[in-house]
Design a protein with these regions (language model features):
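Active-site micro-motifs of SAM-dependent methyltransferase domains
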Residues: 14, 38, 83
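Enriched for short, Lys/Arg-rich terminal
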Residues: 3, 26, 41, 59-62, ...
């Protein structure tokens, strides 16, 4: 069975990932590869109060917020739980 193709919003690559401590970066990368590649719905929770059908994966105090589109998993933001949800309004899944 083929897994999801994991794609990153450009701001995740340019801002979120570089801002992470290297140890946290490794933990998040391992969690994405282990938990989101095949059955992301089993490991993440849907976000309430959003019409975009977004999901959040918990990695300790850090969150990976993503959207599913067909077999694509778009990571929209990665950040500390206290501030990660503030970025969502400015980050959307790019058009198909």
């Amino acid at each position: 069975m083929a897994g999801f193709v994991i794609l990153y919003h450009r701001k995740v690559v340019s801002a979120d990932i570089p801002a992470l401590d290297p140890a946290v970066r490794r933990r998040i990368k391992a969690a994405i590869e282990a938990k989101l590649l095949f059955h992301p719905e089993e490991h993440a929770k849907p976000l309430a109060y959003t019409t975009a059908r977004l999901w959040a994966l918990r990695v300790g105090d850090w969150r990976v917020v993503f959207a599913l589109r067909n077999r694509e998993l778009w990571i929209l933001t990665i950040g500390h739980r206290s501030e990660v949800y503030e970025h969502l309004s400015a980050r959307a899944v790019p058009p198909a």
